[in-house]
C-alpha cells in the first residue's frame, strides 16, 4: 500500500480485529484510494489456506516484469554508478524473496533473472520480500550471458558471488557501475 499503491486492488481485513495496525492499514487504503472490505475468518481460511495471513490480505494486480528491451530503454535513468543484481537460477521462492528484500535494502537499481529455471514472482516470494520487491526494477531475460555481455559493453564491472569468498559485498570498493551475480542454491554460479 505504501510502496506501490497502483498495484493494489482490494484490502481484506478480518472482522473483529481492532488494533493500531488495523487502523493504520485502513488509513493507508483510504489515502491510496484502495477499496477495503472486512471478511469473516472462514473466508480467509478458504481464500488463503496455506498462508499465515494474520487477518490481512491484499489483492493486487499482476505485475509485469521488464525484459531486455525495457532494461536498455531504462538504462540511462540509473545514473553513472548503477548497482545491478543478477540472480542465476534461484529456484526457491523464499530465497528469491530474501534476495529481493536485501537488494532493496542495499539500494540495487535492477534485479535481472533468467526466464527459465528461476522461481516465479509468486505470493510466497512477495511475502518473503516484505515489500522489498515493490519498488525494484525486475527484469527477466532469455539469455543471461548475452545480457551480461551487454552490461559489460555499458562499462559495468561484473562480479560473481562466492560462498567461500573472503570479501563481504558491502566492504568491497564498488565505485562505478557494478553487477553482482549470485548463483543457484545448490550449484552456485554456472559457466555463462
Model-based region annotation:
Residues 1, 91-98, 143:
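Amphipathic alpha-helical repeat scaffolds
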Residues 109-167:
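Histidine/lysine/aspartate-rich catalytic loop segments that bind and position anionic ligands
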Residues 159-192:
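Active-site/ligand-binding-proximal alpha/beta "capping" segment
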Residues 1-73:
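N-terminal positively charged helical leader segments and presequences
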Residues 84-94, 113-114:
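Short, glycine-rich nucleotide/cofactor-binding loops
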Residues 21, 118-124, 188-192:
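Short, glycine/polar-rich helix-capping loops at beta-to-alpha or helix-loop-helix junctions
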Amino acid at each position: 500500500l505504501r510502496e506501490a499503491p497502483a498495484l493494489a486492488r482490494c484490502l481484506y481485513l478480518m472482522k473483529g480485529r481492532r488494533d493500531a495496525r488495523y487502523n493504520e492499514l485502513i488509513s493507508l487504503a483510504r489515502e491510496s484510494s484502495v477499496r477495503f472490505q472486512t471478511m469473516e475468518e472462514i473466508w480467509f481460511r478458504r481464500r488463503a489456506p496455506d498462508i499465515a495471513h494474520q487477518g490481512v490480505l491484499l489483492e493486487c494486480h499482476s505485475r509485469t516484469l521488464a525484459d531486455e528491451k525495457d532494461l536498455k530503454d531504462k538504462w540511462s535513468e540509473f545514473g553513472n554508478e548503477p548497482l545491478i543484481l543478477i540472480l542465476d537460477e534461484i529456484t526457491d521462492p523464499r530465497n528469491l524473496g530474501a534476495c529481493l528484500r536485501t537488494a532493496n535494502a542495499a539500494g540495487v537499481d535492477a534485479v535481472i533473472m533468467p526466464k527459465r529455471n528461476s522461481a516465479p514472482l509468486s505470493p510466497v516470494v512477495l511475502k518473503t520480500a516484505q515489500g522489498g520487491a515493490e519498488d525494484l526494477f525486475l527484469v527477466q531475460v532469455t539469455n543471461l550471458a548475452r545480457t551480461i555481455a551487454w552490461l559489460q559493453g555499458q562499462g559495468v564491472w561484473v562480479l560473481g558471488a562466492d560462498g567461500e569468498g573472503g570479501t563481504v559485498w558491502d566492504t568491497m570498493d564498488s565505485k562505478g557501475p557494478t553487477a553482482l551475480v549470485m548463483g543457484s542454491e545448490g550449484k552456485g554460479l554456472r559457466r555463462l
